[in-house]
Amino acid sequence: MNRRHARSLILIATASGVLTACSKPDPGMGETRKLIMGTFTEDSVTDRAGKAAAATISNTVPGVYVETWPSKGAYMNIEHLFDGTYDLVIVPAGAAYEAYTGTGACEGEKKEKLRAVAACYPIVSTWISPKKLGLSKVQELKGHPLAVGNEGSETAKVSGEVFDVLGIDKENREIWYYGIQGGADGVRDQWADGIHAFTESPVPAYQELAAEDGIRFLSYTDEELDEILDGHPEYSKIKVPAGTYENQDDEVGTFCEKVLVCVSADMDEDLLHE
């Protein structure tokens, strides 16, 4: 199976999926069925998104109540989905892809019955630089000192993937492994000309800088995005609309990893449709 085809199978987020059912619960429907949704650590963004999704399902699907359970992460969620502990799980598209194809952390353990039924929110690649530099594209960061996320973090991993496509690491002698807030401080203190965040949008540390009107948001070219996505089927193109941040006048062309609600193909078809 090629990667493009696998992407089409795993990234299904239909308008008629579980998050957009519109019927109200009928008190005369009889006994309520409880479903368990695995999320992530208590009060994390993923956990809060799971609770919102669970509330939507509970309030719109007749005879169904969804209870959320914190978990130890995406791969554990997928394991518990198939051992019967969970009925639904929230996982990033990358973990879902690896499980579906039996690659990466799920090497040799295909979960071909994994189905994505809705997308909750995107994890977005967002680069910024000081406004005074006059940059508008990520590729223009070549040769500049950069803060690319804490070593071992998801932001640092994705930064490396971007560098492989753009050739940035070959020309940049100053690559600093600072987290998002540390990188933002680097822009203020003028030792970083660019910082990267691979996280939910808007980024709080960026909001503070944007309010000071001292930064610009950088876009990828369409060709760069095509090359990045070609090697990473878990990613999708996305536009960050103008006005997402204060003093952000232009939309930003970038990519994201969707966080998905997934179920097993063995789930009752009528319930899944609801």
Positions of predicted regions on the chain:
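Bacterial signal peptide processing site
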Residues: 23-25
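Short amphipathic alpha-helical coupling segments at ligand-binding clamshell hinges
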Residues: 268-273
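N-terminal export leaders
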Residues: 3-8
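Short beta-strand-centered segments that line the small-molecule binding cleft or hinge
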Residues: 97-102, 112-121
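Pocket-flanking alpha-helical
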Residues: 50-55, 67-108, 127, 181-186, ...
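C-terminal motif of bacterial Sec signal peptides marking the signal peptidase cleavage site
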Residues: 18-21
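Pocket-lining segment of extracytoplasmic ligand-binding domains
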Residues: 93-95, 103-104, 133, 169-267
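Bilobed "Venus flytrap"/periplasmic-binding protein-like clamshell domains
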Residues: 32-60, 64-67, 122-189
